[in-house]
Every structure is written in C-alpha cells, then in structure tokens.
Amino acid sequence: MNARQKPAPVITIDGPSGSGKGTIAFRIAQTLNWYLLDSGIIYRAIAWAMAHYKVPLEDSAGLARLLKRVQISIENRILGKKAKISCDGHDITLAIRSEECGALASRASALPIVREAVLQYQRDFRQRPGLVADGRDMGTVVFPDAVLKFYFDADSQQRAYRRYKELQDRGINVSLPDIQEDLEERDRRDITRSISPTKPAEDAVIIDTTHLSIEAVFATVMNHVRQRGLANVANEK
C-alpha cells in the first residue's frame, strides 16, 4: 500500500447470535461490492480442526500447536458469491454449519489464545474498495478505526426463534427450547469473557432488530452508509 494512501474503509456490524448481523452484512457488502468478513466462519473452522485432530479445549499446549500449523482458506470473499471454506485441504463449507461445530466454536472463541491467533488473519481481510465485517468484537478490537460501526441486538426469544426457523428450513430437526437455552449460554459466555467481550463500541449505531424486518434494518443501515458518503466509494479500486 502506498504510504500516502488511506487504509480501505471498514463497516463493522457486531452483536449476539440471531440479531441479524450476518444477513445485513451480506446485503451491505453485496450492494457496495465490498469484501466480507464473517468472523464466525473462522472460529467454526478452528472448532472443526479441533474436533478433526482431537484437540480438547483443556489442552492449551496442543491448541497452541494446532493454531500455528492449521491452514484455513476462505475463497470468494467478494459478496454475491458464497464462500468456500477449507481447512488443511478439506472442504468444510457445510460441516462447520452443524450445531455441534457452532457450540464448540463458541467455547473456543472465549479463549484468549484463540482470539489472539486470529486477530491479524481477520485484519488481512481489509482490502480496497472496502470491507464489511460482522462478529462480536469487530468495532471494538479488530477494526477500532472503522468508519462506521453498528451494534445489533434483539430479544433472546426472537433471536432463538430466528435460529430455529433457519435450522428448520435447512431440514435440521431441533427444538425451540434447546435453541434458546444454547443461545442464552452463548450470550453469557460472550458477554463475560475476559478478552473481547461482546459489547457495542462507544461510537456504534445501536439497532434493536426485535420487531424490524430485514428490509427495514437494511434500509436503516444504508441510510447511515449514504450519510457517511461510503456508497460513493463503492466502485473505487
């Protein structure tokens, strides 16, 4: 990068599971033709590797070795295309979407050793024309200099129902009470962890999506994008 050139602009969307951040991040990146960082994919890929190589959460030394050698690849990072995720040559695009992988990813992501290992990898997604990043600590830790930050939240029952419907639509038979219990446990873990807890950045736009449609949330976010003049740089290279 030219020393005089400003870093690529970043829009961050943080929030708990089921708040709608992933759906809106996809739509915004697709609209602007920017890169996308779905940080949850990275943690799920690490969880898959832990299960595949039989490295338990309690094995700090083994986990450190795994994080140093494992090769995670995310292809098609420009929106409009579905990402293909591989780990050490294995296509894990579908495997990481299982509830088991998600549960392990949630627990692994609470470990400082894991979050520190993926920090630079996440920052490397920052490329022109721009990046939309969604996760739990995108605006607070990974990209504190983001030009526009959002924090989505919603009632836990509504978030659980959204997740339940998503899994049902994918043909996965689950119970709503189990989904809500798991979601609330993840919330507790994400909010109380010692490193990068889930919370809004001080300068974030906070949106409660409980009673809002996807289109309403998308329109609200795009209004802020236009107000910052970011839509005007959508086609910059």
From Swiss-Prot:
Its EC number is 2.7.4.25. One of its GO terms (cellular component) is cytosol. It comes from the Bacteria. ATP binds at residues 15-23. It catalyses: CMP + ATP = CDP + ADP; dCMP + ATP = dCDP + ADP. This is Cytidylate kinase. Pfam families: Cytidylate_kin. Keywords: ATP-binding, Cytoplasm, Kinase, Nucleotide-binding, Transferase. It comes from Coxiella burnetii (strain RSA 493 / Nine Mile phase I). NCBIfam families: cmk. The lineage of its organism: Bacteria, Pseudomonadati, Pseudomonadota, Gammaproteobacteria, Legionellales. One of its GO terms (biological process) is nucleobase-containing small molecule interconversion. InterPro entries: Cytidylate_kin, Cytidylate_kinase_dom, P-loop_NTPase. It is found in: Cytoplasm. GO terms for molecular function: (d)CMP kinase activity; ATP binding; CMP kinase activity; dCMP kinase activity. Belongs to the cytidylate kinase family. Type 1 subfamily.
